């Protein structure tokens, strides 16, 4: 073997190792930049020596020409579906049927319990360790050949990480799109003026069925294995759970929420636990899959019709329901964004009665081809605002009315414009528009901004409606008599509001910047701006190049900030606020004292009772910590509040230090 070939093989093995550490174990050992450097080194060597390129090289995930269509593949072993249950009683009946066949008490029966991923079932075939074929489930007997697209999914190994691979190994699993990637995909589509996907499952399906693999490679898809089909030349473990762990050991990604449960009661505990975790998993699930763990018992139980007797899907209550669209109202937000809100015939969805749902923007109305009077499909997931994801066009009544997007603001009657490249249409009225003024003032007094206790949304509504305030500075000009004339404002409440306003005059530069409500400037960006410029004058006079030098400030955000300070009325409002006594200390270079969080990676999970997540994050950053969004082997500390979910479980599995909210606050207080 030549020296070049040795280098290439070594690079391939190194890259495969790091892909396994990153995608399967969630334990990256090197930064992305180092992986990229190794990848490009391998790619350069292969380009110089094309005769040494192999199909399983990490560089060969993408590169094939677009297909004319998908070929059909017949599954050697049918890909069966599962029967469903929707209640504890139905689950107990399932267990009883197993008991009658096995003469085994339910308490003694072990189940492998898994989240039911809401994606697409895919079969992947490896021969002598190399990925050679991938197919959709199709009708269970015949699917479509999606091999080229599957090769582009980064967490799927092109070669198994074992020196002794099976002759043939078929692994079955689910391709899905995590919520974060789905959101980014839709945001990018909106920015380009393209159609968006209704939900992550549709996005995953559309991405997998692209005829051009290069398009699929740009989509944030993930695959998790859940079973083995064909296995020739493999000495497989005797239980389903052990088989999944074996798959993981040879590089196949397996879901991290899978648990072993003995007895029906513990299985139901798993169901309820995963249901509670559902909103924070980061990907869609629609239930749990519960499988008899011992393979020998699975074989004894066999199959009925097109489903196994040894497994069941216990589905969650529906997150999608049908109802009728009665009307559409157009609301005006703080930045003038016009949002169409669907007024629905009330319907019970995922435990909540829903009567309103967002329609996002005019493009979404056009995409859905929706009219007033239509029967629509409403989706509610976790804490997400309910949205209409589809229309049952076959049920459209003869008197259905088209939805006309307004050209004038429904509040101030200013022109509505849509800037090229943006999906959102906006009212041009600015602070002349009462709706924008109200929302801007509500933002200004909010806890995360100026934190003015006693001045809430209802009080702001009254003050604006009675033309007592127009700008944030007017709040600090209010007096006791004026406030006491308002509804539900006695002397005590009025004095509390005035005391809060006086207290709020002493603030921080970061809070003040955030309170101004500059588009695209959130708390983290405001903090970065304050730390970078140190004082307001430097920020006001900064040019675009200086603004883009700030962490997390790109071209778009820099332009928003730059334009804000070029508008004279904004300068006037800020000057008026300062004239009313609003002040802060300039940011000084601080030496962070030694503390348990300094130079540590910290993850927050659960609900904190004493402060918001953003406030805790800011405190940690002030103490020199890096605050991450997910737990890995590189996490040093996890701070767990109430209802901590999968992040806490993962931290415990990895042996990461876990700290309670009380312990966190004790440290903060001792070092403040």
Curated annotation (Swiss-Prot):
Broadest EC class assigned to this enzyme: ligase
Molecular function (Gene Ontology), one example: metal ion binding
Listed name of the protein: DNA ligase
Binding site for NAD(+): 32-36, 81-82, 114, 137, 174, 291, 315
Native organism: Actinobacillus succinogenes (strain ATCC 55618 / DSM 22257 / CCUG 43843 / 130Z)
InterPro entries assigned to the protein according to its UniProt record, in alphabetical order: BRCT_dom (IPR001357), BRCT_dom_sf (IPR036420), DisA/LigA_HHH (IPR041663), DNA_ligase (IPR001679), DNA_ligase_AS (IPR018239), DNA_ligase_CS (IPR033136), DNAligase_adenylation (IPR013839), DNAligase_N (IPR013840)
Keyword Manganese attached: yes
Catalytic activity: NAD(+) + (deoxyribonucleotide)n-3'-hydroxyl + 5'-phospho-(deoxyribonucleotide)m = (deoxyribonucleotide)n+m + AMP + beta-nicotinamide D-nucleotide
Role summary: DNA ligase that catalyzes the formation of phosphodiester linkages between 5'-phosphoryl and 3'-hydroxyl groups in double-stranded DNA using NAD as a coenzyme and as the energy source for the reaction. It is essential for DNA replication and repair of damaged DNA.
Binding site for Zn(2+): 409, 412, 427, 433
Cofactor: Mg(2+); Mn(2+)
Keywords: DNA damage, DNA repair, DNA replication, Ligase, Magnesium, Manganese, Metal-binding, NAD, Zinc
Family statement drawn from the similarity comment of this UniProt entry: Belongs to the NAD-dependent DNA ligase family. LigA subfamily.
Classification lineage: Bacteria, Pseudomonadati, Pseudomonadota, Gammaproteobacteria, Pasteurellales
GO cellular component: cytosol
Active site: 116
CDD domains, A to Z: BRCT_DNA_ligase_like, LIGANc
Domain BRCT span(s) in chain numbering: 592-672
EC number: 6.5.1.2
Residue ranges the record marks as coiled coil: none
Keyword Kinase: no
């Amino acid at each position: 073997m030549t020296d070049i070939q040795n280098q290439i093989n070594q690079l391939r093995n190194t890259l495969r190792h790091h892909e396994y550490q990153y995608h399967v174990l969630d334990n990256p050992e090197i930064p992305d930049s180092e992986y990229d450097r190794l990848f490009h080194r391998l790619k350069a060597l292969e380009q110089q020596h094309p005769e040494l390129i192999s199909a399983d090289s990490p560089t060969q995930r993408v590169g094939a020409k677009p297909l004319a269509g998908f070929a059909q593949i017949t599954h050697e072993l049918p890909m069966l579906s599962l029967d469903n249950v929707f209640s504890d009683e139905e689950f107990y009946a399932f267990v009883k049927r197993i008991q009658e066949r096995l003469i085994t008490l339910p308490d003694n029966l072990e189940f492998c319990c898994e989240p039911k991923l809401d994606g697409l079932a895919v079969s992947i075939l490896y021969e002598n360790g190399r990925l050679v074929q991938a197919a959709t489930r199709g009708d269970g007997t015949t699917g479509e050949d999606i091999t080229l697209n599957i090769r582009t999914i980064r967490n799927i190994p092109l070669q198994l990480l074992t020196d002794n691979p099976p002759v043939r190994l078929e692994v079955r699993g689910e391709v899905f799109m995590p919520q974060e990637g789905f959101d980014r995909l839709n945001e990018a589509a909106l920015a380009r003026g393209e159609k968006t996907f209704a939900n992550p499952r549709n996005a995953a399906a559309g991405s997998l069925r692209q005829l051009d693999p290069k398009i699929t490679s740009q989509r944030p898809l993930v695959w998790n294995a859940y079973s083995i089909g064909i296995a020739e030349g493999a000495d497989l473990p005797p239980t389903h759970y052990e088989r999944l762990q074996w798959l993981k050991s040879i590089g196949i990604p397996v879901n991290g929420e899978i648990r072993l449960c003995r007895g029906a009661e513990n299985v139901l505990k798993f169901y309820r636990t995963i249901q509670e975790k559902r909103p924070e998993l980061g990907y869609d699930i629609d239930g749990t899959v519960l499988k008899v763990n011992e393979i020998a018992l699975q074989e004894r139980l066999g199959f009925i019709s097109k489903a196994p007797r040894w497994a069941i899907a216990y589905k969650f209550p529906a997150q999608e329901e049908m109802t009728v669209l009665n009307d559409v109202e157009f609301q005006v937000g703080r930045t003038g964004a016009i949002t169409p809100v669907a007024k629905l015939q009330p319907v019970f969805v995922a435990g909540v009665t829903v009567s309103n749902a967002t329609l996002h923007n005019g493009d979404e109305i056009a995409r859905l081809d929706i009219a007033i009077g239509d029967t629509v499909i409403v989706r509610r997931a976790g804490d997400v605002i309910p949205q209409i994801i589809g229309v049952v066009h076959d049920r459209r009544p003869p008197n259905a009315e088209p939805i006309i997007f307004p050209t004038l603001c429904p509040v101030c009657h200013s022109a509505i414009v849509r800037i090229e490249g943006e999906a959102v249409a906006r009212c041009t009225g600015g602070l002349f528009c009462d709706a924008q003024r109200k929302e801007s003032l509500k933002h200004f007094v909010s806890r995360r901004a100026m934190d003015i206790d006693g001045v809430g949304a209802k009080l702001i509504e009254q003050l604006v409606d009675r033309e007592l305030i127009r700008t944030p500075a007017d709040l600090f000009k209010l007096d006791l008599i004026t406030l006491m004339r308002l509804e539900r404002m006695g002397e005590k409440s009025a004095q509390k509001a005035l005391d809060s306003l006086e207290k709020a005059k002493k603030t921080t530069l970061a809070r003040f910047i955030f309170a101004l409500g500059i588009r695209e400037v959130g708390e983290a960006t405001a903090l970065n701006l304050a730390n970078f410029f140190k004082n307001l004058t430097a920020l006001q006079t900064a040019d675009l190049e200086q603004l883009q030098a700030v962490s997390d400030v790109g071209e778009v955000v820099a332009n928003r900030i730059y334009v804000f300070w070029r508008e004279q009325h904004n300068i006037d409002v800020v000057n008026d606020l300062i004239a009313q006594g609003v002040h802060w200390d300039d940011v000084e270079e601080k030496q962070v004292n030694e503390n348990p969080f300094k130079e540590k990676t910290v993850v927050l999970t659960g609900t904190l009772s004493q402060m918001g997540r953003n406030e805790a994050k800011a405190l940690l950053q002030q103490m020199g910590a890096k605050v991450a969004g997910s737990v890995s082997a590189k996490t040093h500390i996890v701070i767990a509040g109430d209802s901590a979910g999968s992040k806490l479980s993962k931290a415990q599995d990895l042996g990461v230090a876990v700290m309670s909210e009380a312990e966190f606050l004790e440290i903060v207080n001792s070092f403040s």
